[in-house]
């Protein structure tokens, strides 16, 4: 009974601790731990040396009083935002943050060739980004390449499902695009015009000054760059889908028998599922970061192979790992592994390869060629 009581008491303590941690409001998460009673502590009086001289007294350790501007920014107690400043995340090449003393945030987009008009590209990207987010354009001057936006609204939940809090951020911005003299580069300046935060409909204190202002502007820049990256990736996938998938037998950098695709990883990753489906491999799982497909083979009837311009091959009805790797040449290796991640025999890898006839290899793998019923 004693052991049961202690166990129950520990369980209760854990539940209470989790509840307290989960109940923390968003604004409390931006503050240091503990109370702020120290601000009420009276300052000590200067040490009196009686009739001795105070010529050696130093004020180096005296705490200076806050200026009015520092008080507005929030340099005291609970007003101090302990979150680290937002950093630029350059997910696309050629983007750097301009170092300046301005209270505005400027990002440079560098061109990689002399024929590239980066200013026009960034302007088009900016218009597309605003439209994709359904943001109203409050003012626009094409001659000055300047846009003022309506409200961006971003909602995010914090905490566990039992103690979830909802934070809503609303903000508007001015974008100004310039082109430095003597170059094809573009400089995008972002200035936040208004910003507010609510935690479960309760207004939070926000200071649009110094580090806080720059963090807000950089968060938007990072979201813009993320959008640009997604557009770029989508465009690359469209190009990949219109290109053939040339495959040959060979060896990887570890001298392992593999299929080699004369294309980069993105192209190979995108188009390989169509080929695997044609060979009667059903996708079970996939992890792009680790570069593998987990597939399950189900042997078709004898008519399937000639109907789909394939040579038959024998393989156990089981699960297999298809591991993709990037070779030094820029090509992609495809390694065949069994369910225990052991390489298939070279003869079996070769047999599966030769099931792909010349009518299929090096041509576009169209969906209509893969959907014939058994």
UniProtKB/Swiss-Prot annotation:
Q: Which Gene3D superfamilies match?
A: 3.30.530.50, Outer membrane protein assembly factor BamC
User: Where is this protein chiefly located?
Assistant: membrane
Query: Is tRNA processing one of the keywords UniProt gives this record?
Result: no
Q: Lipid modification S-diacylglycerol cysteine sits where?
A: 23
Q: Could you name the domain of life of the organism this protein comes from?
A: Bacteria
A GO cellular component entry from the record: cell outer membrane
Lipid (N-palmitoyl cysteine) linked to which residue positions? 23
Compartment annotation? Cell outer membrane
Coiled-coil blocks: none
Provide the membrane topology annotation: Lipid-anchor
Signal peptide, first to last residue: 1-22
Pfam families assigned: Lipoprotein_18
Output the GO biological process annotations, alphabetical, semicolon-separated. Answer: Gram-negative-bacterium-type cell outer membrane assembly; protein insertion into membrane
Q: Which Cys residues form disulphide pairs?
A: none
Keywords, in A-Z order = Cell outer membrane, Lipoprotein, Membrane, Palmitate, Signal
Q: How does it assemble?
A: Part of the Bam complex.
Biological function: Part of the outer membrane protein assembly complex, which is involved in assembly and insertion of beta-barrel proteins into the outer membrane.
> What is stated as this protein's family in its record?
Belongs to the BamC family.
Query: What protein name applies here?
Result: Outer membrane protein assembly factor BamC
Q: Which organism is the protein's source?
A: Psychromonas ingrahamii (strain DSM 17664 / CCUG 51855 / 37)
Q: Which gene encodes it?
A: bamC
């Amino acid at each position: 009974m004693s052991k049961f009581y202690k166990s129950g008491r520990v369980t209760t303590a854990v539940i209470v601790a989790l509840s307290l941690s989960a109940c923390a409001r968003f604004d409390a998460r931006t503050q240091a731990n503990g109370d702020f009673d120290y601000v009420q502590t009276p300052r000590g009086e200067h040490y009196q040396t009686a009739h001795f001289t105070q010529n050696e007294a130093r004020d180096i350790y005296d705490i200076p009083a806050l200026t009015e501007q520092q008080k507005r920014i929030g340099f005291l107690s609970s007003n101090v935002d302990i979150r680290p400043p937002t950093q630029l995340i350059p997910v696309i090449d050629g983007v750097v943050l301009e170092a300046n003393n301005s209270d505005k945030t400027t990002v440079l987009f560098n061109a990689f060739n002399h024929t590239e008009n980066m200013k026009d590209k960034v302007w088009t990207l900016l218009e597309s980004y605003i439209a994709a987010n359904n943001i109203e354009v409050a003012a626009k001057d094409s001659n000055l390449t300047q846009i003022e936006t309506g409200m961006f609204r971003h909602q995010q939940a914090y905490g566990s499902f039992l103690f979830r809090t909802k934070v809503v951020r609303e903000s508007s911005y001015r974008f100004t695009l310039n082109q430095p003299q003597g170059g094809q580069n573009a400089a995008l300046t972002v200035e936040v015009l208004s910003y507010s935060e609510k935690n479960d409909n309760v207004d939070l204190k926000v200071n649009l000054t110094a580090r806080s202002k720059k963090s807000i502007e950089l968060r938007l820049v990072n979201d813009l760059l993320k959008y640009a990256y997604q557009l770029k990736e989508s465009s690359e996938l469209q190009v990949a889908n219109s290109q053939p998938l040339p495959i040959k037998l060979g060896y990887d950098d570890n001298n392992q028998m593999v299929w080699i695709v004369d294309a980069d990883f993105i192209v190979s990753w995108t188009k390989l599922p169509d080929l695997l489906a044609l060979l009667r491999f059903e996708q079970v799982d996939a992890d792009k970061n680790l570069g593998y497909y987990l597939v399950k083979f189900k042997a078709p009837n004898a008519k399937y192979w000639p109907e789909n311009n394939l040579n038959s091959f024998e393989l156990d009805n089981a699960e297999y790992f298809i591991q993709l790797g990037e070779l030094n040449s820029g090509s992609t290796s495809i390694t065949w592994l069994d369910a225990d991640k052991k390489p298939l025999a070279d003869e079996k890898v070769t047999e599966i390869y030769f099931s792909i006839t010349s009518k299929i290899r090096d041509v576009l793998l169209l969906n209509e060629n893969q959907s014939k019923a058994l």
